[in-house]
Design a protein with these regions (language model features):
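N-terminal donor/sugar-recognition subdomains of glycan-related enzymes
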Residues: 1-156
Length: 156
């Protein structure tokens, strides 16, 4: 499983997971300096409590490289703060919510709801901040470049 993440998401600065599992994967992923933050949403807080007695995550938690959120306790404001802060907002285009293990598939309703809330919040934050002026200038440049072709070769 670690090889999959190292192949696909080696340079991703933010990773999102549903479920904490045994925590060993997170310990390994946090060895990669490119991963600035790993956000874990967990429904069963007892799993985290048990794993904290086995593995030490104190440095990762203090530096906020590992963020564990109990998704049943999150309010709308929590989602907004997470999605609008750096680097989460900056890398919102590469957002995905990954399951920690097959065990968490039985929580598919919660996962879909969480994914929907996060996607909606990212969308709202993006719309609130507006488009990047570089995108608008690129669109104008492409329009002007293609204008002679559109005038001389109409599609109808």
């Amino acid at each position: 499983m670690l090889n999959t993440y190292n192949d696909k998401y080696l340079l991703y600065p933010v990773l999102y997971f549903y479920g904490f599992g045994n925590g060993i994967l997170f310990k390994a992923l946090l060895q990669n300096k490119n991963h600035q933050h790993i956000v874990v949403f967990e429904k069963d807080i007892e799993i985290i409590w048990i794993m904290f007695h086995i593995l030490d995550f104190s440095n990762e938690l203090q530096s906020a490289r590992l963020m564990i959120l109990e998704n049943d306790k999150l309010q709308a404001q929590d989602y907004t703060e997470l999605c609008s802060s750096k680097p989460f907002f900056q890398f919102s285009r590469i957002y995905f919510l990954e399951l920690m293990s097959h065990y968490y598939e039985r929580f598919h309703e919660d996962i879909l709801g969480l994914n929907k809330k996060l996607a909606e919040n990212f969308k709202n934050i993006i719309l609130r901040n507006g488009n990047d002026p570089k995108d608008a200038l690129q669109g104008i440049e492409q329009f002007v470049y293609n204008l002679p072709q559109m005038i001389t070769h109409p599609s109808y």
